[in-house]
Amino acid sequence: MAYFLSKLIPPRPTFVADMSAEERDVMLAHQDYWLPHINAGLVLVMGPVIDPKGAYGVMIVNTPSLKLLEEWEAQDPVILAGQGFAFENYPMPAVKVAPIEPLAPVSSISP
């Protein structure tokens, strides 16, 4: 298994602030599409990044291969809708992942 940062580039920098009702529906379908991957532990985190230069989406994905990730992305409703979204993928060769159930409380961490 390999980790990738997957960046979803919207059709315009202002997308998060001014998406249409149709675009909002596509985004909801996008979230629903990835939910089984999240539940299976393949997508560790997913959500929007509010960057002053333009918002975008990010996922950290644990998958057997980049090819499989690209196949999943090709079936994402945001891509199938043909509204100008695109994915960029970056390998993460040295990843440390917290356990799902923390072994110690946050208060145990010293500054």
Q: What feature does the model see in each segment?
A:
Residues 1-111:
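Conserved, structured core segments of small domains
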